Amino acid sequence: MLRSTGFFRAIDCPYWSGAPGGPCRRPYCHFRHRGARGSGAPGDGGEAPPAAGLGYDPYNPELPKPPAQRENGTLGLGEEPRPDVLELELVNQAIEAVRSEVELEQRRYRELLETTREHRSAEAPALAPRGPNASPTVGPDEDAFPLAFDYSPGSHGLLSPDAGYQPTPLAAPAEPGSKYSLASLDRGQGRGGGGGGALEYVPKAVSQPRRHSRPVPSGKYVVDNSRPPTDLEYDPLSNYSARHLSRASSRDERAAKRPRGSRGSEPYTPAPKKLCDPFGSCDARFSDSEDEAATVPGNEPTTASTPKARADPEIKATGQPPSKEGLEAEGGGLRETKETAVQCDVGDLQPPPAKPASPAQVQSSQDGGCPKEGKPKKKKTGAPPAPSCKDGAQGKDKTKDKGRGRPVEKPRADKKGPQASSPRRKAERPEGTKKKPSSATPVATSGKGRPDRPARRPSPTSGDSRPAAGRGPPRPLQLPDRKSTKAPSGKLVERKARSLDEGASQDAPKLKKRALSHADLFGDESEDEAAGPGVPSVWPSALPSLSSDSDSDSDSSLGFPEAQGPPKRLKASPPPSPAPSSSSSSSSSTSSAGADVDYSALEKEVDFDSDPMEECLRIFNESTSVKTEDRGRLARQPPKEEKSEEKGLSGLTTLFPGQKRRISHLSKQGQEVEPPRRGPAVPPARPPTAQEVCYLRAQQAQRASASLLQAPARLAEKSPSVHISAPGEKRRIAHIPNPRLAAAPTGAKRTLAASGSQSSNGPEPGGQQLKTRTLSGMASKTTTTIIPKRIAHSPSLQSLKKPIIPKEFGGKVPTVIRQRYLNLFIEECLKFCTSNQEAIEKALNEEKVAYDRSPSKNIYLNVAVNTLKKLRGLAPSAVPGLSKTSGRRVVSHEVVLGGRLAAKTSFSLSRPSSPRVEDLKGAALYSRLREYLLTQDQLKENGYPFPHPERPGGAIIFTAEEKRPKDSSCRTCCRCGTEYLVSSSGRCIRDEECYYHWGRLRRNRVAGGWETQYMCCSAAAGSVGCQVAKQHVQDGRKERLEGFVKTFEKELSGDTHPGIYALDCEMSYTTYGLELTRVTVVDTDVHVVYDTFVKPDNEIVDYNTRFSGVTEADLADTSVTLRDVQAVLLSMFSADTILIGHSLESDLLALKVIHSTVVDTSVLFPHRLGLPYKRSLRNLMADYLRQIIQDNVDGHSSSEDAGACMHLVIWKVREDAKTKR
């Protein structure tokens, strides 16, 4: 966004010379574009190219030098559009009738641009006499419309045709000379065929006269003139001027400002813009002709000598400003009429004195303006002074030189001077805004009309006005003034907008109209600033004069600090609003070519022509209630209608709305003269920062590009090298990715398009190309980088919003830890949940459960980790079995490819001989379990029965203690340890209750040693039992080792295996000890294959239900005996069948079966103290499988115990398989 220094403005763009429109579409191009305006107006050749280049560069406010040519026609427009935007909206309806006339004037204006200044000067005198009546109606309306069109920031810019109604003429009427100049100019333009020129010129002339017009008796015209000239002058630059003028006028005459708002609505009609486009080309010619005309003797001396001289010759030669019809009839005449109107406005400022164009008069009038210029010069010490009194005396040649050479300097001066002297300019703006235009006008118009304005402005801001007139650079200073009033950034923006407007005006009136001034975009700022000092009414008229003078003598641009700032837009503005730009350009051409006389006459005629002006004044007065800020916005709205009419150009125009913002800055320049009100207005309008402005511009560019993509712009995009718009359009395609931005503001697109279409006749070709270039360039700058960023960031937009755990004081677990695990839970849940919301809810529930279960941080961490593992297990894995077994033992190609260690783990294709852990069943499991079979020694150590070597059916236990009872009838109770006597049948001889502890003894560490307690009641060892039985009981299994059977070997078929079974038995106490009462066998799938109650051979003394779970009812109907069970088991098992159980020796003793192929879980999971200690099955299941068994008060279940043993053994095998890979 840095401002260009303008070092390359004098060099033709290498990418521009190829075609008339030039392929260069870069809004930031630092080179001169000769063909840009040429397309709009062939006559712009010399000056137009620089102006085009300058206007083309929306970011180089220093480019106002080319505006010197257009400054005459466009500068005023730039200022006027600000107040006119509001007025145009209000006047839209009333001006629709004038739109056609404005269009014609615009076309004529472009034609006039094509014609030499000599031709303008010739036509100007003719236009001056006939302009008086027609000019007010046609001229003002047309001017207003061009300005509105130019001002396209709001409806104002789009209302270029309505600009004909412009309040700038009203501003001009404010001063007697200015008002008449505007009316005369308008009519002269309409009649003379220079309607566009008259319109354009009138805004400028009216802008300055308006400042001085306040003092002038013709107040109604002053208001009316100010408004129409503002609209007319706005084109691109005229809009700037209109803004400044408008603000100045609104400050000086809010009534006038209001009319401008009304007229903004009515003059807003896009039709005149179309005309403006045709005349935009004329305007381009006009710039060239201006330069050439500046050299032309007669007109040049008059214009250069003194604005008065120009105005007088016009008045004398024409007698009366050309009428409206004449204005419409002759485009060239209209332009001259506009210039004449500008000069007349100057003359009005200083009563339209004799047209003496002699350098003496110029100097004398400039002398009056010199003091004013002196101040601006001081302000703009760094900026090259525009031809002020001296320059005015020099003549049109200087105007050319200054217009071309100084436009470059002017931008610099504007930058430097405005920045350096921004404080002074702020103060001077209220005055300088009016005075500068008037001083600039005298310089440009040989001091005739301009000096008067400076004189009148001196009252409001005579010092400022004169310095502005006295220096060409002061015009840039005026931009700085506006800056100072608003902000340096605002000035820069204004300068950029002005330079863009100038380039745009040279390229095409449309382009400038597209360019929205800051005032249009931020109507509040620019209008308020301009209106604050009361300059609005004066500014519009003064700006028209300025633009005319600057075109003719470049003194106007230099003379008017504001004009200098606006000149950038001024030149840019003529193409945008052909009528205003043509009028301003033609007036400037005419003044430079010696149209001073015509201008004076036109000024008088414009002032005298009261019909259109009165109507405009009335409309403006009606809109007086509308705020200056609102006016800019209202003006924007009417342009939306035009936008709808010109959708094809809407995309191109969209960028220019940003430029119109700059135009609004030009308006600020006009307001620079009125810093007091600007200051307040600037903050309101300024609120948008540079970044915000850039963002808005980017949005507008995107919208424009979107519309262009749908239009022939796509074709242009296909051939970017050939067409300037093609590259821009392609960029717009790139912008399309943001459909919101591209499609959001349709109204703005329509407005821009409408303005472009209105100026399509003349400058539209070049202007549209320039617009397209600027739009595409801006779009590419703003959106090309934005699009990729958005695309890259779009994934982040889809990122899941994770819930945040609120902080709580005194929480058990720090919130940070809880939040971390919650995020982990969400990530895991997202892997298997169908929706994000479901995953979040599940994670929240899991985290809450973990938090509720955790009394401390450490426990929460453990629980959270376990929960996280559980959630990870729920997530589907590419290799289902891998997660279960970790694939450590078996490394297969498939497992490695699917595992996390695939890149680090080596694998062998020959190794997968062993099955995967998940497939451990049948023979595979059998082969693995063979590793866990008890050895002979282990069998002996654990008390397993072995066949007796001597007694068939007998068994032997190697761990049994041989106790020889002293008495065969004496027994020892296995529960309480009490000795009791039994009969031969085994019954107790005495009935004694048995007090016992059913729980085992457990040693606990206590202070000073160990303590042994019973697990059942925690009573100390040796204490009385907690349970009572009817009688004592004995085990007796190891004492009776008869009736044992041994499993035998069987032949196996094919692929079958001997089998794997888990076994568990329940026993009850009988008269002979423990005997089998229930047996259960399960397979590897934990399916019960055999389960039955067994009736003991002896009488049951105690069912031992607490442990066996067998009740009397269970055995009541049982007829199965031990022999039956043995027969079944021998048929099921073979010698190689693997039997699994916990302390299986007790079960085998109960079954009286001898079997050595066993897997004992008590041995597989040994007690840490070793034998004889063994861990209970219940504890093993709780520790390893996290399962609780034997928790039923009714006793154990043999099937449950058998299944538990099978689970434990399979788990053990799999765990070992993981570690033994």
UniProtKB/Swiss-Prot annotation:
Q: Which residues form a coiled coil?
A: 86-115
Q: Which GO terms describe its biological process?
A: rRNA 3'-end processing
Q: What are the disulphide bonds in this sequence?
A: none
Q: Which domain of life is it from?
A: Eukaryota
What Gene3D superfamilies would the database entry show?
Ribonuclease H-like superfamily/Ribonuclease H (3.30.420.10)
Domain Exonuclease span(s) in chain numbering: 1060-1209
Q: Where is the composition biased (Gly residues)?
A: 37-46
Localization per record: Nucleus
- Region feature (Interaction with ELOA): 498-577
Q: What is its main location?
A: nucleus
In residue numbers, the region (Disordered) covers: 37-75, 116-598, 619-692, 735-775
Q: In what ranges is there compositional bias, type Low complexity?
A: 357-369, 580-593
- Stated role: Seems to have no detectable effect on transcription elongation in vitro.
Name this protein carries in UniProt:
RNA exonuclease 1 homolog
Organism annotation? Homo sapiens
